[in-house]
A protein has these predicted regions:
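Glycine-rich phosphate-binding loops of nucleotide-dependent enzymes
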Residues: 3-218
């Protein structure tokens, strides 16, 4: 259900019924590129990076929603095109520093660990300057130290940049530790929603995520 939710919000799957409203605007039937222009960005459960490109080049791709190409900028590159290019690069360099990627900025993505690749995906999403950020299992495949780093970066992005974050995760300790509200899904069905302490105490959530035996033991 979570992948369907993400794809419905971002315009890849049209919902069969209901509406998707973002900041008062109905985006239900909106094309993905138009959703992105409404300051929605995402990361992917399965890494969607260009392995043959450097970390910096992958991150720069996130600026595509802000590009405004024109014949004039091409013809008068030194006066019109270059200043815009420098401005985009400045945003990327700031995010690289924010996510502590300076040491690998020029490395090919394929040479990085899973944890660093996930951080590059987050950087690419953040350079789009989103108001709504969707993170699809950003900690999958990470060790505990990498998870803690990523959790800290997500919290900093939310608090310092005023971003609303939709975090999709199976690690309940991470979810309960950093989320303000939780919605638990079981095969597309909402089985619990509310504050973290309310959701983890919900019998249906306990049964779905821990199993009946663990529920009775608790």
């Amino acid at each position: 259900g979570k992948t369907t939710l993400v794809n419905a919000i971002t315009g890849f799957y049209p919902p069969q019924k209901g509406r998707i409203v973002l900041e008062g605007a109905d985006i239900t039937a909106m094309k993905p590129h138009l959703v992105a222009k409404r300051k929605v960005a995402r990361t992917f459960q399965n890494l969607a990076l260009f392995n043959g490109m450097s970390v910096l080049d992958n991150i720069l791709l996130g600026r595509h929603v802000h590009l405004k190409p024109s014949v004039a900028k091409t013809a008068l590159y030194w006066w019109l095109g270059q200043p815009e290019e420098i401005a985009h690069r400045r945003v990327c360099e700031e995010i690289i520093e924010f996510l502590q990627l300076q040491g690998v900025r020029d490395e090919p993505v394929e040479s990085l660990s899973i944890g660093l690749k996930k951080r590059v995906e987050l950087a690419r999403a953040l350079v789009a300057e989103p108001a709504f950020l969707i993170l699809d299992e950003p900690m999958a495949g990470m060790n505990q130290e990498e998870k803690e780093y990523m959790a800290r970066f997500v919290l900093d992005a939310r608090d310092e940049r005023g971003i609303t974050v939709l975090l999709i995760e199976h690690h309940m300790d991470i979810v309960t530790g950093i989320c303000d509200r939780i919605m638990a899904l079981n095969y597309g069905e909402v089985i619990g929603t509310g504050l973290p302490r309310e959701v983890v105490a919900n019998p249906r959530v306990v049964e779905a995520y821990l199993g009946k035996g663990r529920q009775h033991a608790a």
